[in-house]
């Protein structure tokens, strides 16, 4: 089992650092899946137990000038590593304006993801800064729980408003309640609502786009004004919004009535899917 990769392009390095920062805000620990063409950052707190799920995917050729890996076997040419997200984010922050970044799977008394950063001083001399990130190599029997989540057939799909504005609204609502209702319809309307014994507050967003859904979708027979809604933990929504440091190319919210909300984001050439289950 081997893995080594190198980034020399500064724009690619900064983009990879932004992705790592986002993951650190979304998940304390995550699984890094390494395959010949892709890297995935995965969080799979079982939906049945009330946890969120995340699937972040990037094509390795869009980031790395060199990329070599050998999985556990020819038939299973993949590697699954569990790591603390903040450790990777912290290591990459030292790489800003560096000449090159190398990532390698190593064993230094314990399994590590070793990040080597080549820094250049004002006198043009270079020095290497090395970070050894502790990891846990996951055995094959655990892989089945870490596959790409199947996308549920949603009742309503709607494009999100500006995420910074949405975050500002949700932050204010958190001071009133720890639960929130997110609801939307096929007329481009999205509401964020909190209800307590003393107060009911709703923020309305209108004239949003509804992406086209497959012709066999359950939403095809739905009245355009009917709201699909889901009752969620406001902290989980806020954590998702706080993780978005870059304006996405695409941001879609898919609601499965009273079951789950699925956020589908495209950040340049990185895709992010994030699932928040309904409160029971």
From Swiss-Prot:
Ubiquitous. This is Checkpoint protein HUS1. Component of the 9-1-1 cell-cycle checkpoint response complex that plays a major role in DNA repair. The 9-1-1 complex is recruited to DNA lesion upon damage by the RAD17-replication factor C (RFC) clamp loader complex. Acts then as a sliding clamp platform on DNA for several proteins involved in long-patch base excision repair (LP-BER). Belongs to the HUS1 family. Its main location: nucleus. It comes from the Eukaryota. Keywords: Cytoplasm, DNA damage, Nucleus. One of its GO terms (biological process) is response to UV. Component of the toroidal 9-1-1 (RAD9-RAD1-HUS1) complex, composed of RAD9A, RAD1 and HUS1. The 9-1-1 complex associates with LIG1, POLB, FEN1, RAD17, HDAC1, RPA1 and RPA2. The 9-1-1 complex associates with the RAD17-RFC complex. HUS1 interacts with POLB, HDAC1, FEN1, PCNA and RAD9B. HUS1 does not interact with RAD17. Interacts with DNAJC7. GO terms for cellular component: checkpoint clamp complex; cytosol; nucleolus; nucleus. It is found in: Nucleus; Cytoplasm, Cytosol. InterPro entries: Cell_cycle_HUS1, DNA_clamp_sf, Hus1/Mec3. The gene is Hus1. It comes from Mus musculus. Gene3D superfamilies: 3.70.10.10. Pfam families: Hus1 (PF04005).
